[in-house]
Amino acid sequence: MTYPWWSLLPFVAMLACIALLPIIPKTSHWWEKETSQLSVALLLGVPTTIWLFMKAGNGPLISTGVEYVQFIALLFALFVVSGGIHLAGDIKATPRNNTIFLAIGGLLASFIGTTGAAMLLIRPLLETNKERQHRVHTVLFTIFIVANCGGILTPLGDPPLFLGYLHGVPFTWTLTLWKEWLFTLGLLLLTYYSIDRVRYASEDTASIESDDRDVQPLRLHGKINLLFFAIIILSVAFAPSWDGEALAEGHFDSWVDLVPWREVIMFTVAGLSYKLSD
């Protein structure tokens, strides 16, 4: 089924609100309220949902709703488990160390999600660079490398890749993109290292000396969550779940097909992580 071009307008309007309302003086404070954001979402989403239901029936809505639940389950599990890990410590904030931090984050993002990797690394990265005066570029490149470009090697890395996996793209297909991933990551890391060397050279002596004195070894707390990450990865790769299109059409062989085993595992893992983490 095809839809007219103007059916995209509510989505475009939502993106425009997210991008513009926070920076417009007359609407910035209003937009900070969750009730305002919810009002805009309902104003644009409810009429669109009703129109789609009247045009296409409940099949596409059920199928899309199933995908949404599957996506939220993965995001929720990764968010909770990554929140249970704390990488503590404070090493020297040299360009070399910062670049290694970002490189590790760019790799981890493919396996624990861009959100999970960013949550795990941003705190020790900020702690490491707290003595430096020039650190904004480090946060920006963390967003570029860890929270964006890094998560491309598995469907867990980024939401569009996971949605593609739900639509039949093989779990290991994204590994074929390793050359593109390596090129992009290498280019960003080289750019960051060059910028950070210049900014590091412009730091005053007092900041560098303070950074050299305040050094603590890195320590990983909540190690049990590494096991939970492994369980999530295995569940995405091997555990069965709902087939949205089959459910929408009423096609299933037994009650087993009605149980979202993958999501059950994810929510269970998230609950265990919440209970067992430090």
Predicted regions and their residues:
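Juxtamembrane and boundary regions of transmembrane helices in multi-pass small-molecule transporters
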Residues: 134, 154, 163, 172-216, ...
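Hydrophobic transmembrane alpha-helices that form the pore/transport pathway of multi-pass ion
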Residues: 96-150
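Intrinsically disordered, low-complexity non-transmembrane regions of multi-pass membrane transporters
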Residues: 1-7, 11, 17, 42-47, ...
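Central hydrophobic cores of alpha-helical transmembrane segments in multi-pass inner-membrane proteins
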Residues: 10-25, 41-52, 70-85, 122-126, ...
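Alpha-helical transmembrane segments and, especially, the helix-loop junctions at the ends
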Residues: 113-118, 137-169, 189-194
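Transmembrane helical segments that form the transport core of multi-pass membrane transport proteins
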Residues: 229-278
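Transmembrane alpha-helix boundary signature
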Residues: 23-27, 47-67, 79-94, 107-120
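Interfacial loop-to-helix junctions that mark the boundaries of transmembrane helices
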Residues: 1-7, 29-39, 58-70, 171-181, ...
